[in-house]
Curated annotation (Swiss-Prot):
ATP binds at residues 30-37. The RecF protein is involved in DNA metabolism; it is required for DNA replication and normal SOS inducibility. RecF binds preferentially to single-stranded, linear DNA. It also seems to bind ATP. One of its GO terms (biological process) is DNA replication. Gene3D superfamilies: P-loop containing nucleotide triphosphate hydrolases, RecF/RecN/SMC, N-terminal domain. It comes from Shewanella sp. (strain MR-4). Pfam families: SMC_N. This is DNA replication and repair protein RecF.
Amino acid sequence: MSLIRLNIDSFRNIQLAQLSPSSGINLIYGQNGSGKTSILEAIYFLGMGRSFRSHLSQRVINNEQDKLTLFATLNLPRGDSKIGLRRFRSGETEVKIDGEKVKRLSTLAETLPIQVITPESFSLLFEGPKSRRQFIDWGAFHSDPQFYAAWVNVRRVLKQRNQLLRNNSSYDQIQYWDREFVRYTEQVTEIRNRYVDSLNELLKGIIGEFLPQVDVKVSFTRGWDSKTDFAQLLESQYPRDLATGHTVSGPHKADLRLRVGSLPAQDALSRGQLKLLVCALRIAQGKLLKQQIDKHSIYLVDDLPSELDAQHRQLLLKQLVDTGAQVFVTAIEPAAIVDSLHTPPSRMFHVEQGRVTVIE
């Protein structure tokens, strides 16, 4: 799978751009503020319905316009597919796939799986468990068609349960929701656990390429003691949950634990090593997607020269090429990427003040 055409209209400082990317390595270069990262952000927005840089989607709309429009043609095994997204400053979103209106943004994510390696994505290890849950759930969503519905139900029931707790409801009033919570939690947890097990099989070899002298152990924690029955735990922790006004334990507390020896990876590794570990996780996740559903991710790699030294840039780019996936990578100077590749980029784009030029 790859993008063979991309149209960007009124996205940040890009008034209008049309790109015909290669299915291999696409290098986008230009000075800071030129708009090169905005191209990656536009692709991400088209696949996720949101930005990886800002939680306020209205900010990505060009200041002089009341809406943005993104359009792409995808090359898929079954043939070409067309995706369009329009976001209005009012917050309304319109999505079409092959001319048909789509109501759920999850359909975009299913159609256009995207992996991001940016300065922001390194928060996967530097921050709390939320980003690591999102990492697991991205893979679980793509690997098992039953995951999304179960995950939505977990969120719905958890919201209802927390509202009852804030209202000082008796446990008799909460019991019905707990039965629902347990049922959907079991589904979500089983799929998450199975996904992490599969990821681990691939991850060992890839981590060995990036960090050959480091033994990293990866494990999934479900959000409560695995030796404890979840239904019994909810009942026994009801007084504590009532006191805090929210559910203390459950699938919303799940995490991906990475350890080196007896220490968390965050404490045992340098910041540079942690960045390489995040790269290994993203590469492994993309390779597993290809194994499980025979679909490539699209990789968006932003500002690589500022994040990794020349040796590790070369290693990451080699790994990306080996995936066979389509890659978009940005840099200020093209030489920083070209010199790290064994072969020239398949296509190069220069960006200046929001204008995109193909370099032949």
